[in-house]
């Protein structure tokens, strides 16, 4: 019998449901001597945790910025980096919402807009880039609620704490309480 091994997986919060509900159980079924312990947060916060000593065997970042920083700082060997997954941003509303917002074109109608904090949350960085590209980011500053990770943004919209939010498509699909 093989010795049991525990791997630490550090992954963007947007990937938690996918890993916990599907990938980890399947991996552990195929590899009964290996247990996977998931640590989920924004990629920026995970980068900091790794720099401060988190021993992650695998790191799934939502953006190249954090991965590149860890490679530059020699926490990760560049030959071990693989671009494996991709996602896209979507605008969501709660299923029970009364907002008139139907898409990015009329996002200014929202009273509150939840996005990830662009300083540490890749989805927030991408949301800022998209809204800047549309010429809207600065004009909407007073409406933003900045989440610590994409799951927090999703939960704010699902609970009607925010009119709309910008999250990854996979997160929107994982919640029955929001619509794209």
Regions found by a protein language model. Give the residues of each.
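A short, gly/pro- and small-residue-rich
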Residues: 73-81
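Short, well-ordered coil loops that connect the C-terminus of an alpha-helix to the N-terminus
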Residues: 32-34, 56
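Periplasmic-binding protein-like
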Residues: 57-61
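Short glycine-enriched, charge-decorated loop/helix-capping segments at active-site entrances
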Residues: 45, 54-55, 78
């Amino acid at each position: 019998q093989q010795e049991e091994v525990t791997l630490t997986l550090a992954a963007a919060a947007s990937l938690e449901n996918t890993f916990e509900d599907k990938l980890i159980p399947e991996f552990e079924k195929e590899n009964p001597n290996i247990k996977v312990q998931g640590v989920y947060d924004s990629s920026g916060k995970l980068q900091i945790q790794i720099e401060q000593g988190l021993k992650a065997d695998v790191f799934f970042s939502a953006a190249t910025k954090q991965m590149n920083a860890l490679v530059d700082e020699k926490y990760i060997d560049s030959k071990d980096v693989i671009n494996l997954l991709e996602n896209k941003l979507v605008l969501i509303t709660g299923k029970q919402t009364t907002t008139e917002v139907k898409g990015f074109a009329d996002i200014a109608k929202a009273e509150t807009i939840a996005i990830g904090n662009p300083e540490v949350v890749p989805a927030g960085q991408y949301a800022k880039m998209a809204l800047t590209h549309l010429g809207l980011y600065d004009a909407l500053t007073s409406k933003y609620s900045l989440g610590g990770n994409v799951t927090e943004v999703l939960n704010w919209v699902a609970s009607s704490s925010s009119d709309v939010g910008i999250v990854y498509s996979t997160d929107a699909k994982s919640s029955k309480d929001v619509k794209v």
